[in-house]
Swiss-Prot record:
Presence of keyword Lipid biosynthesis: no
Quaternary structure and interacting proteins, as annotated: Interacts with B3GAT3; the interaction increases the 2-phosphoxylose phosphatase activity of PXYLP1 during completion of linkage region formation in a B3GAT3-mediated manner.
Active site, per annotation: H97, D379
Glycosylated residue positions: N305, N354
First-level EC class: hydrolase
Keywords carried by this UniProt record: Glycoprotein, Golgi apparatus, Hydrolase, Membrane, Signal-anchor, Transmembrane, Transmembrane helix
Protein name according to UniProt: 2-phosphoxylose phosphatase 1
């Protein structure tokens, strides 16, 4: 009995100490760790590497895992966050397609055996996957802009075709769509229950993986949507430049950027040694192996946990993978420093950004069309937009990456509108070149829409130098 009483006494004492400790922390009588800049961890914009959760030195395997974006528990996101007196007006979503089969094969090796049929009880799983498959099977009469109407609405090959979307890719975008549904529809009522076709704007390139990714996100966002209300427009260019694709100066920037990439590769003796070793394993000339872009296929093996290929001469291994991935990371770092890609990005991203602000400006006038815009695209679409916005530290677009522009109206001052920019759920608005100094100049909590409009209409051309003040002049500048 005495032992039992002592045990109960100790238990009560422990509970009391825990309560006191939590109370002191709540009232900030015990200091809690805060970042050096004084911001709380909740408000800190995590576009920069987080020293607590990320390796102190760049780790190629860690970066590759982030790139794979393997579906897991629901992620935390900052979409839809604004002061209570702001009303959400429109949302503009740019996505990279989900996980896909490689575009290239390592010469003389067996293709990775990945099943591109959709199976509801196979990992990765999503609660809406079976319903998605059923709904897609009813969409054969969907009316899309040619040539999209000739593409399959979902992946369905026991052995994936080159570049085909995988089940992982479908699940990634079902998750994206459901997350956006919870925030924009359930919380902010962006669209009415009886939404109409003209309240959506949907555009995709002519690849099955982008159309299917767009449909997966759309199904997560608007489950069991009416096929008669869905119309995807076809975009021939990965830059989504529509009728403004001819731009000689942009092409010159790209040529110089590709030259920079080539020279950096030549300087990397370890990379050349690795390519040489791999070429011997598969018994092809080093030049042929390099041209096959082996990292594309190796990433598929890595993301799907499939062994790297072997021949009688040996096996491609993780060390080879690390060397090539490390070079990719170094290439991205030098790309930011040299600014050639930045020049390419300003001109490459201008048409799609110009379309976006035009759509936003129409929404500020009270127009109810195109309140939700979705561009289903590629890494080579999102990467220039990120660079042009000044988000130089943003990671290269992972599978199923999402970049979102939100337009908000101040209910207390209805004529004033603001924007938020989010990348993979992180609020990066105040990292953009057009709003990074906003808090120094204004007490307003949100970035004014005028900042983005001025950036697209004027500042993008100023950043290029020269005397051009519009897209045509900047694209045809002499003496570049």
């Amino acid at each position: 009995m005495l032992f039992r009483n002592r045990f109960l006494l100790l238990l009560a004492l422990a509970a009391l100490l825990a309560f006191v400790s939590l109370s002191l922390q709540f009232f900030h009588l015990i200091p809690v760790s805060t970042p050096k800049n004084g911001m709380s961890s909740k408000s800190r914009k995590r576009i920069m590497p987080d020293p607590v959760t990320e390796p102190p030195v760049t780790d190629p395997v860690y970066e590759a895992l982030l790139y794979c974006n393997i579906p897991s528990v629901a992620e935390r996101s900052m979409e839809g966050h604004a002061p209570h007196h702001f009303k959400l007006v429109s949302v503009h979503v740019f996505i990279r397609h989900g996980d896909r089969y490689p575009l290239y094969v390592i010469p003389k090796t067996k293709r990775p055996e990945i099943d591109c049929t959709l199976v509801a009880n196979r990992k990765p799983y999503h609660p809406k996957l079976e319903a998605f498959i059923s709904h897609m099977s009813k969409g054969s009469g969907a009316s899309f802009e040619s040539p999209l109407n000739s593409l399959p609405l979902y992946p369905n090959h026991p052995l994936c075709e080159m570049g085909e979307l995988t089940q992982t890719g479908v699940v990634q975008h079902l998750q994206n769509g459901q997350l956006l549904r919870d925030i924009y529809l359930k919380k902010h009522k962006l669209l009415p229950n009886d939404w109409s076709a003209d309240q959506l704007y949907l555009e995709t390139t002519g690849k099955s993986r982008t159309l299917q990714s767009g449909l997966a996100l759309l199904y997560g966002f608007l489950p069991d949507f009416d096929w008669k209300k869905i119309y995807f427009r076809h975009q021939p260019s990965a830059l989504f430049c529509s009728g403004s694709c001819y731009c000689p100066v942009r092409n010159q920037y790209l040529e110089k950027e590709q030259r920079r990439q080539y020279l950096l590769r030549l300087k990397n003796s370890q990379l050349e040694k690795t390519y040489g070793e791999m070429a011997k394993i598969v018994d092809v000339p080093t030049k042929q192996l390099r041209a096959a872009n082996p990292i594309d296929s190796m990433l598929c093996h890595f993301c799907h946990n499939v062994s790297f290929p072997c021949t009688r001469n040996g096996c491609v291994d993780m060390e080879h993978f690390k060397v090539i991935k490390t070079h990719q990371i170094e290439d991205e770092r030098e790309r930011r420093e040299k600014k050639l890609y930045f020049g390419y990005s300003l001109l490459g991203a201008h048409p799609i950004l110009n379309q976006t602000i035009g759509r936003m400006q129409r929404a500020t006038e009270g127009r109810k069309e195109e309140l939700f815009a979705l561009y289903s695209a590629h890494d080579v679409t999102l990467s220039p937009v990120l660079s042009a916005l000044g988000l130089s530290e943003a990671r290269f677009p992972r599978f199923a990456a999402r970049l979102i522009f939100e337009l908000w109206q101040d209910r207390e001052k209805p004529s004033e509108h603001s924007v938020r920019i989010l990348y993979n759920g992180v609020d990066v608005t105040f990292h953009t070149s057009f709003c990074q100094d906003h808090h120094k100049r204004s007490p307003k909590p949100m970035c004014p829409l005028e900042n983005l409009v001025r950036f697209v209409k004027r500042d993008m051309f100023v950043a290029l130098g020269g005397s051009g003040t519009n897209y045509y002049d900047a694209c045809h500048r002499e003496g570049f």
